[in-house]
């Protein structure tokens, strides 16, 4: 809750929504994700997420975004982009907070295939748009090191 409250967003919109799923509901979520893809996902991969302690569902309120688009029409095209950017910042903040607590996590994107089923399972309002799923739990292993790259290709410093 603290992390969600602290992450900024454009126009102080507070469009981000978080649902944290534990226990049998967490298991059901991952079984439903597997079923939604009709065997196209590796069962072992889905079971690795299911083995976690829980899952954070990241969403944003499209009604909030629509209201801002109407109120500030000059920026209308930007509000969905800004909602996703704010959601990304929230995802990183939650992931970092979990890591500080020595809890492992990964970020998954099985939407839009699972969107409607997730809303049904957890009584999520229809105007909420699912963005990502973050299963979390014990740290099984450290992530593989990232490939070396020429960071100068991605970062420019102008003086």
Task: Go through each PLM region and give its residues.
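Short, surface-exposed loop/helix-turn segments at secondary-structure junctions
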Residues: 32-37, 70-79, 122
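N-terminal amphipathic, basic helical "cap/leader" segment at the start of enzyme domains
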Residues: 1-55, 158-159
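Short acidic/His/Gly/Ser-rich catalytic and metal-binding motifs that mark active-site loops
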Residues: 64-69
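Beta-hairpin (beta-strand-turn-beta-strand) motif
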Residues: 23, 59-63
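Acidic, glycine-rich active-site loops and adjacent beta-strand->loop/helix elements
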Residues: 62, 111-115, 140
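Small-aliphatic-rich amphipathic alpha-helix that forms the alpha element of a beta-alpha
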Residues: 4, 72-119
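Active-site-flanking beta-strand signature of metal-NTP-handling nucleotidyl enzymes
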Residues: 55-59, 134
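C-terminal helix-cap and adjacent tail motif
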Residues: 130-159
